[in-house]
Swiss-Prot record:
UniProt organism field: Candida albicans (strain SC5314 / ATCC MYA-2876) (Yeast)
CDD domains, A to Z: MADS_SRF_like
Annotated protein name in UniProt: Transcription factor of morphogenesis MCM1
Stored SUPFAM superfamilies: SRF-like
Keyword Nucleus in annotation: yes
Length: 262
């Protein structure tokens, strides 16, 4: 009986020790959990897409930043992100004392704003509303650039549609002047041919009707030493001592600064 009682006492002592050990372990676990909660950093990210509040930071997955094709998921993401950015704007204005103006427009055209008091007239007055509406109604810049580039490429591929070069009035005037000069030259050549035909030998029994200079008188404008001398290219007529008197009334347009003597 004594052995049995000792055994019971020992077993009871062991049970007491086990209870105390369990209590110590529970207290240690609670302390470690409290320390972990104190040392763990506070998550300030409001990105809740694809995650739940019960999941830890390690279980979060990174989403690819691209346009969401599914309409329902796109609307859900818009609602969550809009609420998060509005919250961030409010916290920024309160924590730092800065003025914040946040403008968010949904896919359906609804406008959401967050403004601090000093910037609130920008979205409440008619001028600000009209400016926002004008910006929303403006065409897309990227689309306009693509259309312009496409139109430029079309004009480059179709040379038949290119405008004709503008005529320069100076060039036209110069061409007309050159044509006029050419006509004058032709007239001068015709006059010279007629003069050569009139230079045929005449009979020596009389003087021409246009003769005005007496024989022996020199031609004014010709040096005295050259008067009465034969010049090459001018035929001398029989019965005339002064070759210049015969050609006195014949006007040659090819000779510059010529004068006609009578």
């Amino acid at each position: 009986m004594a052995i049995k009682e000792e055994t019971n006492e020992f077993s009871q002592g062991n049970e007491g020790n086990s209870h105390s050990t369990n209590n110590n372990n529970n207290s240690n676990n609670s302390n470690s959990n409290n320390n972990a909660d104190v040392s763990a950093p506070v998550d300030d990210d409001d990105d809740d897409d694809g995650t739940s509040q019960g999941k830890t930071q390690k279980e979060r997955r990174k989403i690819e930043i691209k346009f969401i094709q599914e309409k329902s998921r796109r609307h859900i993401t818009f609602s969550k992100r809009k609420a998060g950015i509005m919250k961030k704007a409010y916290e920024l204005s309160v924590l730092t004392g800065t003025q914040v103006l946040l403008l968010v427009v949904s896919e359906t055209g609804l406008v959401y704003t967050f403004t601090t008091p000093k910037l609130q007239p920008l979205v409440t007055k008619s001028e600000g509303k009209n400016l926002i509406q004008a910006c929303l109604n403006a065409p897309e810049e990227g689309l306009g650039d693509d259309q312009e580039n496409q139109s430029d490429g079309n004009t480059g591929d179709s040379p038949d549609q290119s405008p004709a070069p503008a005529t320069n009035p100076n060039v036209m005037g110069a061409a007309g002047h050159a044509h006029h000069i050419q006509q004058q030259q032709q007239q001068q050549q015709q006059a010279q041919q007629q003069a050569q035909q009139q230079m045929a030998p005449m009979p020596s029994h009389g003087l021409p009707t246009h003769y005005s200079n007496p024989q022996g008188a020199g031609n004014p404008g010709v040096p005295p030493q050259q008067q009465g001398q034969h010049q090459p290219g001018i035929p001398l007529q029989g019965g005339y001592s002064d070759q210049y008197s015969y050609f006195g009334n014949i006007q040659n347009n090819n000779i510059p600064n010529q004068q006609q003597y009578q």
